[in-house]
């Protein structure tokens, strides 16, 4: 039995969100194929994600200097512990599905806040004399990114979404990365439904081997 972490970042309800609806199609097919797997849901707009702020940086600095968590200020303890909770949940998963829209050639700010909360030195990567090394490598972990945007940006230099997520997953050691991208729905609204159905087919296929 595998543990799937299903992370969404979208303000729109399922009924009108293209990325969420494609993600939902993936999830239904995935659970048909893997009925015994655990699925843990994280909604980055609903579930509070601790951002890196002055208290977090101060707390990390004290910990690196040899202090214990108990000696930090109340705010430092609370916020650092919350970051660790996010990272530990991420580490506990075997598979990851991220469902996102494109905002201004990248991601919503909440998504970057989440990545910052799980890409943590000593948790998901470490430093060595030869450079940073992902601590999640060679463990059979998989990542699927379901992403939508209104134009045609995928595969171009201007796309700071899919390539970034693939890179940061690899940085932590998760190298089995696949994406399902729905794009062009605003640029060519007459073909929006056709584009969506093509993405749904890709999502179903991904679910069958994920």
Curated annotation (Swiss-Prot):
Entry annotated with the keyword DNA-binding: no
Record Pfam families: Flavodoxin_2
Binding site for FMN: 17-19, 102-105, 148-151
InterPro entries: Flavodoxin_fold, Flavoprotein-like_sf, FMN-dep_NADH:Q_OxRdtase_AzoR1, NADH:quinone_OxRdtase_FMN_depd
Any one GO molecular-function label of the UniProt entry: FMN binding
Enzyme class, first EC level, given as a word: oxidoreductase
Cofactor list: FMN
Enzyme Commission number(s): 1.6.5.-, 1.7.1.17
Cofactor descriptive note: Binds 1 FMN per subunit.
Keyword entries, A-Z: Flavoprotein, FMN, NAD, Oxidoreductase
Domain of life, per lineage: Bacteria
Cysteine pairings via disulfide bonds: none
Catalysis: reaction(s): 2 a quinone + NADH + H(+) = 2 a 1,4-benzosemiquinone + NAD(+); N,N-dimethyl-1,4-phenylenediamine + anthranilate + 2 NAD(+) = 2-(4-dimethylaminophenyl)diazenylbenzoate + 2 NADH + 2 H(+)
Similarity comment: Belongs to the azoreductase type 1 family.
The protein's role, per its UniProt record: Quinone reductase that provides resistance to thiol-specific stress caused by electrophilic quinones. Also exhibits azoreductase activity. Catalyzes the reductive cleavage of the azo bond in aromatic azo compounds to the corresponding amines.
Subunit and partners: Homodimer.
Protein name listed in UniProt: FMN-dependent NADH:quinone oxidoreductase
Organism annotation: Citrifermentans bemidjiense (strain ATCC BAA-1014 / DSM 16622 / JCM 12645 / Bem) (Geobacter bemidjiensis)
